């Protein structure tokens, strides 16, 4: 852990350079960062990061982040793989998946569904299946509602 000032002085210029290089090559800059990055998310966006992963559910307020940044960055929005997916019921996973879609998806796009990190080996297959099926069916239903 380090202060925002150290991040801005030491690391941000490197992210700006990486983002510029990616954009010069015609590709988006995707970035993964675990933990609570709310205080430096504006910096990442200003640096040119196009896609951020995962907006970790136990570390940040997903609803506030989605509302504030929805037209500024694309979210590689992650289902909670630490608690919900491995320990929740199938219905919990279905509800959590719908909430994730409702939180991050909007008419202009800006949401790619994923896991918030690696799926734990002890995760019940029924939960993984419920997550993927719900993401596909509810996500499709949501997209069709925008037309």
List the predicted regions and their residue ranges:
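Active-site loop segments of alpha/beta catalytic cores
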Residues: 1-147
